[in-house]
Amino acid sequence: MGIKERNAPSQYKQSSRKNKRAWRKNIDLEDIESGLEQTRDEEIKGGNVEHKPNDALFVIDTLGDDRIAKRSRKKIKPLKVDQILENKSSIEKVHSHLTNNSTESNKKGKIFSRKELNRLQALVYKNKDGLTATSAASELKNTKQPKESYDVWETNPTVTIPVKRPSTLSKLPESLTENNAKVPNVVIADPGMSYNPDAAAWMKLLDTKGSEELKKEQKRISELEEKERIQKKAFEDKGLVSDQDVNHSIDSDDQSEHEQAETPIPSSKNKRKTRSQRNKIRQRREEELRLLEQKKNEELLRTIDKAPAISKKLQQKDKAEKFSNKAVSSSTTEIKLKKKKFGKHRLPNNPLEIKLGDELTSSLRELKPEGNLFADRYLSLQQRAMVPPSLPVLKKSKYRAKIKEKYSHKDFHLQKNSI
């Protein structure tokens, strides 16, 4: 076999640098990358310094350097001789009092006696009337009022505290009624509450009070049903059965012994609506809104046509209200409260004071009174925000009740045998 020829190793081919693609590929980006890295570091450290305001970069120093203050406060070290001669005793020395008889001080002329000083001041500050400053001052001193004296040994000193008028007395109480209507002190009762009422007034009052009581009863029943439903749901979630369900199931088993047919149980989960169903619901809603708007516009056009007649009726009504009896109007109107709560508790409702058909009497001798005048006055005070509503407080014992075993427990066996 012949020897194979070995070619030279292939050299690195440099890519052509004539087109723009090669320029982008082989360009040097070290400066740009270093700049981006620098901006990244500045953002990590708190942001670019050039774009920050002066308040974020500089602070006005109002305290100063503590080291300079300490250096200025530092005392000059005294000499050793002065330190030895310094008085280090904690007891003060006895000062010598200067007297008026001291000849040296008088000779030097530095210290005057009190009498000499008063004489010189009188010569200098002499008034036209002849009064001196010292005499005027002494007169003022004598005219001062003497201090009040009191007995130190008094056992029960009488201290008089001045009574302060509260600021709330000058303010009106908060109005609890709608439109800040004034609540009368004594509300006149409805004509239907009379012992011998008019038939129409009595029937009207009976209808209003009966509808109110019916609403209260319906509300109470609905709350009770909702409570039972929640309780039943809680039992079902836990996998238990309530007592009512057990009794109901026993009764239903007794009744359905002869019935074999089973009704399918509908699924409680709501099915997802399709797009067409949602579109139909939306279109129906839009159509209802359009019809409602059209109806409102038609009614508005009708009222515009009847505007003169309506204005005439309103004027007649205003005239009738002006000439009507104020007492009757105030008695028939019922007080409407805008706030049902004043303080911690709710305002109590007006008591139901009405006679039924079998309770109506034609004479005062057979009349059974309804309500209480004291309770009515107190309720009026609460409605006028003069007295806050409260609940009756039960009387509590001062001491806690203790459970104690009686001595008769030892005769338990005897009682058991006797039984």
Curated annotation (Swiss-Prot):
Pfam families: Nop53. Residues 233-261 have a biased composition (Basic and acidic residues). Keywords: Nucleus, Phosphoprotein, Ribosome biogenesis. It comes from the Eukaryota. Residues 1-21, 233-283 are annotated as: Disordered. May play a role in ribosome biogenesis. PANTHER family: GLIOMA SUPPRESSOR CANDIDATE REGION GENE 2, RIBOSOME BIOGENESIS PROTEIN NOP53. Belongs to the NOP53 family. This is Ribosome biogenesis protein NOP53. It comes from Schizosaccharomyces pombe (strain 972 / ATCC 24843). The gene is rrp16.
